[in-house]
């Protein structure tokens, strides 16, 4: 069984351009604009919900105490925020097949 290929942004641009008949540069501009708007919304604390696909959101990780592996010294790990994706039902169902 061959390994699955990673699909890059350039691959997606090529595939969308082929499927729609639009020029690659126009599709790339749209993809870049979409991703920039998702980043902007997340940076502003908003969720981005794409019905049937999923939701992008910022989640919070609480502060906690950790241990440095080399010295076994206890360290404080500060609270952080990180981007997360929760797949929608339609995407989950598609992947299960």
From Swiss-Prot:
UniProt keyword Endoplasmic reticulum present: no
Pfam family, one: Bac_DNA_binding
Keyword DNA-binding: yes
Single Gene Ontology MF annotation: DNA binding
Cited Gene3D superfamilies: IHF-like DNA-binding proteins (4.10.520.10)
InterPro entries: Hist_DNA-bd, Histone-like_DNA-bd_CS, IHF-like_DNA-bd_dom_sf
Gene Ontology cellular-component annotations: cytosol
Keywords of the record: DNA condensation, DNA-binding
GO biological process: chromosome condensation
PANTHER family in the cross-refs: DNA-BINDING PROTEIN HU (PTHR33175), DNA-BINDING PROTEIN HU-BETA (PTHR33175:SF3)
Task performed by this protein: Histone-like DNA-binding protein which is capable of wrapping DNA to stabilize it, and thus to prevent its denaturation under extreme environmental conditions.
Subunit (UniProt): Has been isolated in complexes with 5S rRNA and bL25, and with 5S rRNA, bL25 and uL5. Homodimer.
Family according to the record: Belongs to the bacterial histone-like protein family.
Name assigned to this protein: DNA-binding protein HU
UniProt organism field: Thermus thermophilus (strain ATCC 27634 / DSM 579 / HB8)
């Amino acid at each position: 069984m061959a390994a699955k290929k990673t699909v890059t942004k350039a691959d997606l641009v090529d595939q969308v351009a082929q499927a729609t008949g639009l020029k690659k540069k126009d599709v790339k501009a749209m993809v870049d604009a979409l991703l920039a708007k998702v980043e902007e919304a997340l940076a502003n604390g908003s969720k981005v919900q794409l019905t049937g696909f999923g939701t992008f959101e910022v989640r919070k990780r609480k502060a906690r105490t950790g241990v440095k592996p080399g010295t076994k010294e206890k360290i404080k790990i500060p609270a952080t925020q990180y981007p997360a994706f929760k797949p929608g039902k339609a995407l989950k169902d598609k992947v299960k097949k």
